[in-house]
Amino acid sequence: MKIAILSRDGTLYSCRRLREAAQQRGHQVEILDPLSCYMNVSPVASSIHYKGRQLPHFDAVIPRIGSAITYYGTAALRQFELLGSYPLNESVAITRARDKLRSLQLLARQGIDLPLTGIAHSPDDTSDLIAMVGGAPLVVKLVEGTQGIGVVLAETRQAAESVIDAFRGLNAHILVQEYIAEAKGCDIRCLVVGNEVVAAIERRAKEGDFRSNLHRGGMATVAQISDEERAIAIKATQTLGLDVAGVDILRATRGPLVMEVNASPGLEGVETTTGVDIASRMIAWIERQATPEFCLKIGG
C-alpha cells in the first residue's frame, strides 16, 4: 500500500516509528506537512497538491495532527478521504474528540462515568458553578489547553473563584472538574487500536504537581488494568468514532472515570515503558480496514 503520514515534523518519535513499521511490512510511506498541502476542490477533478506537484492516490492516511492545526489539518485529511484514502481516524472523529465539551457530552450520553464537570464561558454566579461539581478542591482548566497547560488545582473555594475569575478575563471557555484526591496524582493511559487495548501505562505526577502528563515531567510504569477499565477505554474510543486513541482514566473510589480521549496519542511514552510495538499494531489495523469497499464508501 501507499501510505501518507500527515505531520508537521517527520522526525518526531511517533512518525519515525510509524514509517519504520509500515516499511518493514512492505508499504511505501511519505510524510507530508498538512499545512503545505493545498487542494483543488472541484466536482470533476478534485486533487491535492504538495510543494508544486499533484499528489498520487494514497491507499491510507495516518493523521498526526497537533491541536494547534486542527482546522486546516482535518480539512486536508478530509480531502484525502474524499479522494478515497482510508484514514486512521476520520477527520470528523478527530474534530469531535478535540472539542472537549462535545466529547464529554457524547461520553456522558453513552453512560461513561466522568469526573463531575461544569463548563462555562462567563458564569454570572461563580459560586453556583463551583457547587455544581461538589465544591473545592477542584480543577480548573482552559478548554483549549493541552498537555497540562492551562490546568490549575484550586484547593479552596476562594482560590477557585480567583482562578475562574482570572480565566474569565481571558475571554476563554472554562472547564471545572471535581478533584479526585484518591487518584493521588496518577492516571491510566490506555492505548486503543481498533477494538483492543494494546497497552496501558500508569502516569504519576512529579513531586509537588498533580498533573500526570509526561510532557510535564510525569513518570510512567506499566499498568495492569481491570476488565472494567479495558471495556470503558474501548467504549470511549468507539463513542467518538476513533480507530486509535489514548484514553486517560482516573481510578476513583466509585470506579474508573474517563478524563480525556486523545485522538493523536504519542507513542514514545507507551512503547518505551511497555515494550509493545504499537506502531505495527496500527499498521496491521490499516491493512485489515483499508479495503476497496471501505475506501469507496468513505470517498462518497
Swiss-Prot record:
PROSITE patterns on file: ATP_GRASP (PS50975)
Keyword Protein biosynthesis attached: yes
Q: Which InterPro entries match?
A: ATP-grasp, ATP-grasp_RimK-type, ATP_grasp_subdomain_1, RimK, Rimk_N, Rp_bS6_RimK/Lys_biosynth_LsyX
Broad class of enzyme this protein falls into: ligase
**SUPFAM superfamilies per record:** Glutathione synthetase ATP-binding domain-like
Where, in this chain's numbering, is Mn(2+) 2 bound?
E260, N262
CC cofactor note? Binds 2 magnesium or manganese ions per subunit.
The UniProt annotation places Mg(2+) 1 binding at D248, E260
Q: Which UniProt keywords apply?
A: ATP-binding, Ligase, Magnesium, Manganese, Metal-binding, Nucleotide-binding, Protein biosynthesis
- Give GO terms for biological process: protein modification process; SOS response; translation
Q: Is Secreted tagged as a keyword? A: no
Annotated residues for binding of Mn(2+) 1: D248, E260
Q: Which Gene3D superfamilies match?
A: 3.40.50.20, ATP-grasp fold, A domain (3.30.1490.20), ATP-grasp fold, B domain (3.30.470.20)
Q: Quote the EC number.
A: 6.3.2.-
GO MF assignments:
ATP binding; metal ion binding; ribosomal S6-glutamic acid ligase activity
The chain positions of domain ATP-grasp read 104-287
For activity, the cofactor(s) needed are: Mg(2+); Mn(2+)
Record-listed Mg(2+) 2 binding positions: E260, N262
Pfam families, per database record: RimK (PF08443), Rimk_N (PF18030)
In terms of NCBIfam families, this protein maps to:
PRK10446.1, rimK_fam
Query: Which family, according to the similarity comment?
Result: Belongs to the RimK family.
Q: What is this protein called?
A: Probable alpha-L-glutamate ligase
